[in-house]
Regions:
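N-terminal pre-domain/capping segments
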Residues: 1-88
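Distinct, well-ordered alpha-helical segments
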Residues: 23-28, 154-170, 186-199, 261-264
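Acidic (Asp/Glu)-rich catalytic clusters
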Residues: 25-31, 48-65, 81-96, 133-138, ...
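Acidic-and-aromatic substrate-binding clefts and catalytic sites of carbohydrate-active enzymes
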Residues: 40-52, 71-81, 151-159, 184-191, ...
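Gly/Pro-rich active-site loop or hairpin
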Residues: 47, 77, 115-121, 125, ...
């Protein structure tokens, strides 16, 4: 993976999300996995089984933290109690970088527990970038923001989603967690060219890539993480890594979770694209 300041100058390969149904298999069979991604909020506790399991994983594998509730796009201040808990976990996992979503989801201390799309305005970009910088400085760790899937748009938007992403990461001087499936989902819902999106992303800021499956519901495509990756998403992934180089890639599978072996096998499909890129870079 091309080393850059947004992934802590580390080289990771292909990972999968650490999920409860797979704990027993992992501990009994000790499969060869490049790294696991954990949802930070699942481990913000003072003790008990979650941390005991995590410590067992950390003894054998590398881990990267992925958050779901920073809500950089919300107008209220960052929750510093939450940040302190995140920082405690960071010290435990030694994650080389931390990711969360480019979205909003809270108002006046009330949380939606959802990843809501942003209005693509210059003011929203300014507020969001300031909060990303604040979190990065507090955590003393590189941060990468993830593009979310969306099913609605704001009339007040002043730019495209990819222009907004670029505006935020430039102002925040942060990395990108490039979710290729989310780009595909949103492109189908909002009728834009996903390759134009990928071609606009600043390659030097991509710290990590997500791939996943999705579902169709009536006229919308939903980012459900409950199916294998479809061919059009693999084609986008291939295009993405040709632009950014071999990059830490994570398969998300969060619902209707099959066996560990099936998830692992699906994730390893990403590997067939990497040798081509590595040869091209020689």
């Amino acid at each position: 993976m091309p080393a850059n300041p947004f992934n802590g100058f580390t080289e990771y390969g292909i990972g999968i999300g650490l999920r409860i149904p797979h704990y027993r298999h992992i501990f009994e069979h000790k499969p060869v996995v490049d790294w696991f991604e954990i949802i930070s909020e699942n481990f913000l506790v003072d003790g008990g089984r979650p941390l005991a399991v995590l410590d067992q994983i950390l003894a054998q594998y590398r881990v990267v933290q992925h958050g779901v509730s920073m809500y950089f796009g919300s107008t209220e201040k960052l929750n510093h109690d939450h940040l302190r808990r995140i920082k405690t976990l960071v010290k435990r996992t030694k994650t080389p970088w931390l990711t969360d979503h480019l979205c909003w989801g809270s108002v006046d201390g009330t949380y939606s527990h959802d990843l809501l799309p942003m209005p693509y305005t210059f003011e929203a970009a300014r507020v969001t970038a300031r909060k990303v910088r604040e979190a990065r400085d507090f955590l003393e760790l590189p941060i990468a923001v993830e593009n979310v899937s969306s099913y609605a748009e704001f009339h007040v938007s002043q730019m495209t989603e990819w222009e907004f992403l670029n505006e935020v990461v430039e102002q925040a001087d942060c990395g990108i967690l490039l979710d290729v499936n989310n780009i595909y989902v949103s492109s189908q819902n909002h009728d834009f060219d996903p390759f134009e999106y990928l071609n606009s992303v600043p390659a030097g800021r991509v710290a990590q890539i997500h791939i996943a499956g999705h579902s169709k519901f009536e006229k919308y495509i939903l980012d459900t993480h409950d199916h294998p990756v479809i061919d059009p998403v693999w084609k986008l992934y291939d295009h993405a890594i040709r632009r950014v180089g071999p990059t830490a890639t994570l398969l998300e599978w969060d619902d209707r979770i099959p066996s560990f072996d099936e998830v692992h096998q699906e994730a390893r499909k990403a590997g067939k694209f990497l040798p081509q890129i590595e040869e091209a870079l020689v």
